[in-house]
Amino acid sequence: MDNKIFITLGSQKFQFNRLLKAVDELCEKGTINAEDVFAQIGYSDYLPKNFSYKKFLDRDEFSNEMEKANIVITHGGTGAIIGAVKKGKKVIAVPRRAKYGEHVDDHQLQLIKQFDDLNLICSCQDTGKLDVALKTVQLTKYNSYESNTVNIINSIENYIKQIKV
C-alpha cells in the first residue's frame, strides 16, 4: 500500500491501545507499509513496534503530518474527523469504547454513524476489520465537507428581520 497514513488519537486522557495494536499487526503482516504510517498516540501506553509515533504534536507538527497523509485513521472525536474531512482526507474513524477504558461512554459510536451516514468517512467499529476499512476507503468517493455557517447566519438574519417588524 503506497498511501501515507496519519493516525491521530486526540489529547483526552484515555488510552486507545486497541487501535494502535491493530495497526501494528497490519504492519507486521505487510498489509500496511510501516514506513508510510505516523501516529500521534496521546495517552496510550502501548508503544507501536512497527511504525513511527509521538505522544503529542504541536500545531505545526500536526498540520505537517495531516498535510502529508492521504488517509487519516482517527478516534471518533468530532474535531478530529471534521478537521481531516475539511482537508479532503480519506478518513477511517474508530470509536473509543467505554468497555475497553477508552472513554467514559460510547457516544463516539453515534457520532461516527452520523458522519458515515453523510458519506463523509469510513466507519470501522471493529479494529479486527481495519484491513477491510483500508480497502474500502481507497475505493470509495466520499462527499466533501460543507460548512453550515452561511445557513446559520441567514437564519439569524431572517429571525432579526422578523422581530424588527
What residue ranges belong to the model's regions?
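Nucleotide-activated sugar donor-binding and catalytic core shared by glycosyltransferases
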Residues: M1-V165
